[in-house]
Amino acid sequence: MKILKLLSIFGIFLGLSLIAFSLYFTFLPLKETSPSTTQSQSNKITEPESTQQEEPVIEDVKQEELKESGWIPNWSFDTGITSVRKNIKILDEVNPVLYTINNDGSLSKRTIPSTSIKELNSLAKDNDIQVIPTVGSNDYTSTTAMFKNSSIYKSNISSIIEEIEKYDFDGIDLDFEQIKSEYKDTFIQYLQELKNELSKKNKILSVTVFAQWDNAEYKTNSETIQVQDLTQIGKIADRVKIMAYDYTEFTSSKPGPIAPIDWIEKVLKYSTARIEKEKIYLGVHLYGYEWVGEKTEALTYTSVKNILDTLSIKNAYNEDVAEGYAKFSCEKGKETCEMYFQTKEGISKRKELANKYEIKGISYWRLGGELDILH
């Protein structure tokens, strides 16, 4: 009896213990989790890893637009100003040929009215166009006189600086087309000293040179080309303008292209290997040559257009050389005339090459009489 009573009490105690144990776990508080952890886990979507490689990101780098400049000859100054007005939106720089070198080596201003110079200067400044006048020399006498004596060329430099300050020009362009080879070192020294003085005034040095395309002996201008060391000039000058025309010269008795496109490419390839690309300007001709027998006549594009219109000549363009070409009977008799000249298509091809070689710009010879060929 006593044993049964004890078992009964033990059973009651065991039952109460199980109930208490169950209630404990029922009301036990859950472990808190941070809201951020909970949200990130609930929103996480597991995606299969892509087996395809990501495409490389290629930046679309826009090439800087070609700068366009043009020379204005002293003998057609007013016509040149008219051309600047007409092409005001495309020009970045103009180079009026205002100066030359006297036989004694001194700087000489060409006969151009001061009012015309001021008119051009004002027009250019109002339209954010740089004015960098040219000092041109086409004979050995003047350059020899200047380079044989350092005091003379130093005086020449001082005169250039004075003129730049007088008219507030943006710099100076040098076009010395006849220099004796013995003055090569002196010429380079002259450039360096001129550059030093221009830099003090924050002005630009531009040097115009003949086209070079190999290391061969050149038939014409060979002595000057020896002096025009592209590598040395390129280190000193801010801009180097290459006269990439007159492949077939005015003096040639046989007709031929003025600047065939394949030759221009050789010139650019040769030049860009020696001069920083951002300094190079490709010279582009805007004129034509007409051969009557063995005689040659230089023509503006206006004259070329008149001939083509008068004779009803159409599609006068040679794709092989990227120039205009026409062959016709001359008015003067039974002789055959041949004419090579610039065209819109030709200019476009030259711009394509300039962009291909990533040079700075192009320079037109010359502004005036080109009609709408630049548009």
Question: Where does each model-flagged region fall?
Answer:
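N-terminal Sec-pathway targeting helices
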Residues: 1-16, 25-28
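Short, acidic/polar
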Residues: 73-89, 147-165, 221-231, 342-355
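Glycan-recognition patch characteristic of GH18 chitinases/ENGases
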Residues: 30-32, 39-154, 158-159
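Glycan-binding loop/region signatures in secreted carbohydrate-active enzymes
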Residues: 284-350
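Substrate-binding surface in catalytic domains of secreted glycosidases
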Residues: 107-112, 180-311
